[in-house]
Amino acid sequence: MEVYVPPPRVLAPTEGRNSISYNPLAPLQDTTHIYMIDNKTSDIQNMNIAKDHSNFFTNIIQNVDVAPSDAATQDIKLDSRSRWGGQLDTILKTNCPNVTEFFNSNSFKALLMSDKTDPTNPVFTWFELTIPEENYTLSSLIDMLNEAVVENYLEVGRQHGVEVSDIGVKFDTRNFKLGRDPVTTLVTPGAYTHKAFHPDVVLLPGCGVDFTNSRISNMLGIRKRAPYEPGFTILYDDLQGGNVPALLDLAKYPAQTVPLEVDENGLTYHVQEVAPKSWQTLYRSWCLAYQAGGKIKTTHVLTVPDITGGLGQVYWSLPDTFKAPVSFTNNTTDPATLPVVGMHLFPLSSRVVYNTTAVYSQLVEQMTNTTKVFNRFPKNAILMQPPYDTVQFISENVPYVADHGTQPLRNSLSGVQRVTLTDDRRRACPYIYKTLATVTPKVLSSATLQ
């Protein structure tokens, strides 16, 4: 009687197909953990002299009996008869301010009057205005933007006959239309409501702002409806229907119902009579134009301010650990082209803090601190410091824990592994503070017939 002999694959030993070998020690079966840690003491220092926490080399050999320099020359073998996968878990900590040159959030362009030597033919010039890198609240950011405009006036415009009332770009938080009488067309309280609402941009004729290469528009809650369309400028002519109403002159009321032409210092409000007994100022507000449903509403959209600037994503690359995903190549050492094995949002989050005494605190600060630089024109209803909002937006770096799933591993892992994190433009980021990763190998399938 012939004895049945099953195919060799059935009787082939399974022990060893899931073995993980490191020469100085006995093989492991089934699973282990591989740790990747930035700047730990067992790393070889001279390999990371010019590196940072987002692009570094780390030693994954944890043998305390072997010097780091020797352990780095060794490797970990995963049984070649099996296809291996690695469960990738990461922890990331950042210390990123919300206004930085690196992320294009500390500057914007403004079209301002630069020369009024000939009053009939003033000259307007585009200037790139920069504010210091810092972690700002929304109110402080608006103060700094206005200060940048005023500093430009003091440096350029004032030297060429430009008057204070010709400062044509103002960032504000008020709703200038509150209190407007529909019959007289004047703001009847004689003052604009001193309460913060949505961030706003106020312009004079010939002026504008350009956020093409700036994230500041995201912080102000002003965005394009077609975000991939090139360019992002806001010009005076775009703000049709957004003229700021004139104030009622209380000194002449009720004998006369006329607009207030100038402030206490003689600075004009640029009031114009558009019809008999109907006035408005030449100032135009982005928010008023948007709420009026004009042309600006078809191209722009009012959003919640993102005080982080709308930072994008973080890409993880471990080119010496994982096999390259489809469409990627391993024949590169450039961080911009390394294979990506993980992705998540940049861990800078916007937080909302409710402060019922925001304006009170602002007034106390003005009286007790030397902060007059933010309120250079307190008597001018347009150029005065805008009120702080009771809802404060702040940015916060939040440690981010991510599970990137199981991905195919190499069968041989060298003792030194490269870890690279890049931003949404595939650049190593200087604001990465701590980088941790754990890889858990496991067998996915057989790599041989037996």
Swiss-Prot record:
InterPro entries: Adeno_Penton_B. GO terms for molecular function: structural molecule activity. Induction: Expressed in the late phase of the viral replicative cycle. Its main location: virion. GO terms for biological process: endocytosis involved in viral entry into host cell; virion attachment to host cell. Keywords: Capsid protein, Host nucleus, Host-virus interaction, Late protein, T=25 icosahedral capsid protein, Viral attachment to host cell, Viral penetration into host cytoplasm, Virion, Virus endocytosis by host, Virus entry into host cell. It comes from the Viruses. One of its GO terms (cellular component) is T=25 icosahedral viral capsid. It is found in: Virion; Host nucleus. Pfam families: Adeno_Penton_B (PF01686). Interacts with the fiber protein (via N-terminal tail region). Interacts with the capsid vertex protein; this interaction binds the penton base to neighboring peripentonal hexons. Belongs to the adenoviridae penton family. Major capsid protein that self-associates to form penton base pentamers, each in the shape of a pentagon, situated at the 12 vertices of the pseudo T=25 capsid. Involved in virus secondary attachment to host cell after initial attachment by the fiber protein, and in endocytosis of virions. As the virus enters the host cell, penton proteins are shed concomitant with virion acidification in the endosome. All late proteins expressed from the major late promoter are produced by alternative splicing and alternative polyadenylation of the same gene giving rise to non-overlapping ORFs. A leader sequence is present in the N-terminus of all these mRNAs and is recognized by the viral shutoff protein to provide expression although conventional translation via ribosome scanning from the cap has been shut off in the host cell. This is Penton protein. It comes from Snake adenovirus serotype 1.
